[in-house]
């Protein structure tokens, strides 16, 4: 999701790289016999892959060619249908939350990382596992954090109530409009951005095995969920949380100095920097008694189970994309906080993204299980209803739980 405008060099390099894409004149069909591998990646990722691809070709004689395509539901559907026919790329880049669907359809192959896997943060390693099997090479981890406008406040709130109190102080003393801003959606809600507050009450979305993998049993019901629902209702009643605050309104209000705090992911950093703001990135403080843990979205490389050049695809993924220089290069081209511990150390001169990367190490991987598809709509609608005061918070929450469980069954 990170904006690529800041990375101007990537755009210039891309024009050269695309001469090797399958869409270029004379490029071979994906299913043709070849001494090459095809990698499908996004516009901001291809420049960061080029040097690693060139090194691989020098070492092995196997060419690495790129297909530029942004990952969305249609791209995943196409990969699933084309993989068995030999028409899909050998490697794709995707958010990890598509892994459950890919693995269930048998279109991705396990990737053995060996010792190099230890350089990745634990949650990045966990995110690319499905049923105990590792399927991917992570490179970026994104989660939300608290961005503070240092010109309005230098407080470091230890609880979310402290944040609200400081936000109201700034509103009174400096005339800003909001105590904090956070992305919402008037129609669908936004449980993603509110998840750190929810987990601080101990109400994770699904229960997890000892290994950390998710089961399809909901964990956000019961007393912990009720406490979060009551807190949401209070946020809505006070006017601190507004369902009308769209992503653009939240970001623009913070950038123009109308809020001292902003809950957002690293995709907003480039515009904040362009505005010349003096900001600090902090963990979201807890609203409840436990640590506030946001979702982590892990960007990773996955190998086609039906790759036309499976040995080379596995070799490139496990032995080249895991290298420190490859991970550094991907950070430079995409701006995504790294999944590699070494790469995190190497960006110490970028304090904002370093903070995001460090905060993301404690984030919870977004569930990649199929049951997650039953959650979002009911979850967001229920949260909106609670914030808007459409009913008793506990009753609305319990109805949401019943609706989701009905869908999962």
Model-identified regions with their sequence ranges:
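Extracytoplasmic/periplasmic substrate-recognition and gating elements
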Residues: 273-333
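Conserved C-terminal helix/tail region of periplasmic/extracytoplasmic solute-binding proteins
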Residues: 361-409
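Long, aromatic- and glycine/proline-rich binding clefts that accommodate carbohydrate-like moieties
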Residues: 128, 330-381
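Hinge/lid segment of periplasmic solute-binding proteins
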Residues: 96-143, 162, 281-282
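Conserved N-terminal structural module of periplasmic/extracytoplasmic solute-binding proteins
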Residues: 2-98, 288, 403-409
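Glycine-centered hinge/linker elements that transmit conformational signals in sensory
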Residues: 212-244
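A structural signal for short loop-to-beta-strand junctions that line the ligand-binding cleft
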Residues: 80-81, 88-90, 117-151, 291-292, ...
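Extracytoplasmic/periplasmic solute-binding protein
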Residues: 135-139, 144, 164-217, 259
């Amino acid at each position: 999701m990170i904006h690529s405008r800041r990375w101007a060099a990537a755009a210039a390099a891309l024009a050269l790289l695309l001469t090797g894409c399958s869409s270029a004149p004379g490029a071979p069909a994906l299913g043709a016999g070849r001494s090459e591998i095809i990698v499908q990646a996004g516009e901001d990722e291809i420049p960061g892959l080029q040097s690693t691809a060139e090194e691989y070709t020098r070492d092995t004689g196997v060419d690495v060619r790129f297909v530029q395509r942004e990952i969305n539901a249609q791209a995943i559907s196409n990969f699933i249908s084309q993989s068995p026919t030999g028409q899909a790329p050998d490697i794709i880049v995707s958010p990890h939350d598509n892994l459950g669907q890919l693995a269930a359809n048998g279109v991705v192959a396990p990737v053995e990382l060996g010792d190099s896997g230890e350089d990745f943060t634990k949650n990045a390693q966990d995110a690319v596992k499905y049923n105990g099997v590792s399927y991917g090479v992570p490179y970026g981890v994104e989660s939300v954090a608290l961005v503070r406008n240092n010109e309005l406040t230098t407080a470091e709130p230890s609880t979310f109530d402290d944040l609200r109190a400081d936000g109201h102080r700034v509103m009174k003393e400096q005339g800003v409009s909001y105590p904090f801003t956070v992305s919402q959606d008037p129609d669908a809600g936004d449980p993603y951005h509110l998840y750190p507050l929810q987990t601080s009450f101990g109400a994770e979305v699904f229960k997890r095995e000892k290994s950390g993998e998710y089961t399809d049993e909901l964990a956000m019901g019961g007393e912990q969920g009720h406490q979060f629902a009551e807190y949401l209702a209070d946020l809505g009643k006070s006017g601190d949380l507004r369902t009308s605050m769209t992503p653009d309104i939240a970001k623009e209000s913070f950038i123009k100095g109308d809020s001292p705090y902003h809950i957002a992911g690293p995709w907003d950093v480039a515009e904040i920097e362009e505005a010349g703001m003096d900001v600090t990135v902090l963990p979201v403080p807890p609203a409840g008694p436990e640590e506030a843990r946001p979702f982590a979205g892990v960007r990773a490389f996955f190998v086609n189970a039906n790759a036309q050049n499976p040995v080379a695809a596995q070799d490139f993924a496990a032995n080249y994309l895991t290298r420190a220089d490859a991970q550094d290069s991907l950070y430079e081209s995409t701006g995504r906080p790294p999944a590699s511990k070494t790469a995190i150390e190497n960006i110490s001169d970028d304090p904002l993204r370093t903070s995001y990367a460090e905060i993301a190490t404690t984030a919870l991987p977004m569930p990649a299980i199929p049951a997650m598809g039953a959650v979002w709509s009911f979850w967001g609608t229920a949260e909106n209803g609670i914030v808007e005061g459409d009913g008793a918070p506990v009753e609305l929450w319990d109805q949401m739980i019943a609706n989701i469980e009905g869908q999962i069954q």
